[in-house]
Design a protein with these regions (language model features):
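Extreme N-terminal basic, low-complexity initiation segments
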Residues: 2-8, 12
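N-terminal transmembrane-helix/juxtamembrane module of multi-pass inner/ER membrane proteins
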Residues: 10-107, 141-166, 304-308
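Hydrophobic alpha-helical transmembrane segments
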Residues: 100-119, 175-185
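Membrane-embedded catalytic cores of phosphoryl/pyrophosphoryl-handling enzymes
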Residues: 159-306
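Alpha-helical transmembrane segments
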Residues: 48-59, 131-133, 206-207, 264-267
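Hydrophobic alpha-helical transmembrane segments of integral membrane proteins
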Residues: 124-153, 212-220, 224-227
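Interfacial segments of alpha-helical transmembrane regions
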Residues: 112-136, 201-202
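Juxtamembrane/transmembrane-helix boundary motifs in multi-pass membrane proteins
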Residues: 39-46, 88-92, 116-121, 125, ...
Length: 308
């Protein structure tokens, strides 16, 4: 009798778990966009204080620097820090080579492309924030014209993983800006309600963001301050993107299934581009992007076919 009671109790628990999981799946499938919209409504402008403080302190530091030339002061002031971080982080070259690719829109966007189908609001904000990031990066890189580490330091003095980046477009790091736009949007979009979960979620997301951003130092492509300012600017672009889309719904057409054929064509082109990347470099991270693109193409195609 006791054994039968235990079995019934166990089955009841399993049944409850199944119902909870089923309800969770149903919420994810049909209410995820509403969940994201509601979370974005709680994002406030005061949350820009920290990244703006970072920017102010950064420019004050160089404003009162003894060097008259910003570029010279910028490069020399962090040489020791760059060499130290590069040496430490480059201890895992294969990992760094893969995760640094996550700062590339052609690689990171496919990994979250499925939310175009399940949470289009996230993509409305992502496109707005990405446009802001693109403009900021282009203007600042051209204005400051800071040479890359490999253009200034002896290339035998530090570790370069993958491609050797030259030229004068080091500041700020575009990869860091991109990844932090994505990280901050995901952070707020899927912020849990419980405080304990919120803390864990925030720490995990920020840890992932910092790890990816500072991989740019590990591969020898950027100075540490390039990354720090890139992070701050990405944070700012994400918050502004959220606030803009809370008030101006200029990309609301994204969720309209009439435009699915255009998205399907875009996904096919994107798949081809990722395949070319795989042919050229064959990194595992590219396969994850490819699988995500193929899966999303299947979902959107099926949804469009059912509608028609």
């Amino acid at each position: 009798l006791t054994k039968n009671t235990m079995q019934r109790t166990f089955c009841s628990v399993i049944g409850c778990l199944k119902n909870m999981i089923y309800k969770k799946i149903m919420i994810n499938n049909f209410g995820l966009d509403a969940f994201v919209v509601n979370n974005f409504k709680h994002v406030k402008l005061w949350q820009l204080m920290l990244p703006f403080l970072v920017l102010i302190l950064f420019f004050l530091f160089f404003l009162f620097s003894e060097e008259t030339n910003f570029v010279d002061a910028y490069v020399e002031s962090q040489k020791g820090l760059f060499l130290s971080m590069n040496s430490t982080l480059a201890a895992y070259p294969n990992i760094q080579l893969n995760i640094t690719e996550l700062g590339d829109v052609f690689v990171i966007f496919p990994l979250i492309i499925v939310f175009l189908f399940y949470a289009p609001k996230l993509w409305e904000v992502l496109l707005t924030s990405s446009l802001i990031t693109l403009i900021l990066a282009a203007v600042l890189k051209k204005y400051f014209y800071v040479p890359r580490p490999a253009h200034v330091y002896d290339i035998d003095s530090f570790i370069i993983i993958g491609k050797t980046h030259l030229g004068n477009k080091s500041f700020p790091s575009g990869h860091s800006m991109t990844i932090f736009v994505v990280i901050i949007l995901l952070l707020f979009a899927f912020m849990p309600k419980k405080k304990s979960y919120t803390i864990v979620w925030s720490l995990l997301m920020l840890l992932a963001g910092f790890s990816i951003a500072f991989s740019r130092v590990a591969v020898g492509a950027h100075y540490p301050f390039d990354v720090v300012i890139g992070i701050a600017l990405g944070f700012i672009a994400a918050i502004i993107g959220i606030r803009v889309n809370n008030n101006v719904r200029w990309l609301v057409w994204i969720k309209n299934k009439r435009f699915y054929p255009g998205f399907m064509l875009l996904l096919i082109i994107w798949i081809a581009l990722i395949i070319l990347k795989i042919i050229d470099h064959n990194l595992p991270i590219f396969y994850l992007s490819l699988m995500s693109l193929v899966g999303t193409l299947f979902l959107i195609t099926r949804a469009y076919a059912k509608q028609n």
